[in-house]
């Protein structure tokens, strides 16, 4: 799959009354190329779930535009999207077998029974959903999502209630899905160490805005960890710094060559970089070329503020 999976221009979502409502997203502009595995990270309340709901066509923007799989109305391409929300709303009275049957009936022409059965694997087919553990419900929800053979898969904290072995197994399945079918995956998570090995794209949301966006490798390589006794960090942009005795350690966004005579230079891990940006909300945003959109080029008619739910 080639092209752009998701593109946002000035995207905003406000809940409540116009004057005193809560802004979940504000002026978000970014692009996600198709076929990527994107980590959507940020603190609680940052706007991650709101962004996923908008992309799934379950909510409408209050401002700006959002294009998903080429459509400015994500609900119109819902048959090409799979969404696993945090609460995994399955029918509790149905059995596992009934649930898989319903998935096939609701997705005629797209359903991949072999994949759904493989993901549901160890689940007892006669067990009712209400008797399943949290991790088992997650497995069943992912079986429905992957069985649909979506072009875009949206996952909201999908691995939180899985044990480490199941988490590793299902993460491998997601990676294989992308490699084989070019599926675009957007996955929100707080498990930063797992995202580093699984995701090749990154969107950091904080305060309802996109703080970082682009290829994970490009974002990491744009930064450096500097350690030394020197105090002048110019011309680099300081994200975070700390002093221990006479030694200064700083995470910087590089603005030209680093003076290796004055500084010991190492590349930060993705986890170190994300944590530093989360601790430093005033650090300027960074979108790499693959994530940037042309200022003012709005796809479709720009939405004005509308009455919010």
Descriptions of predicted regions:
Residues 168-252:
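ABC transporter nucleotide-binding domain
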Residues 3-193, 197-200, 204-206:
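ABC transporter nucleotide-binding domains
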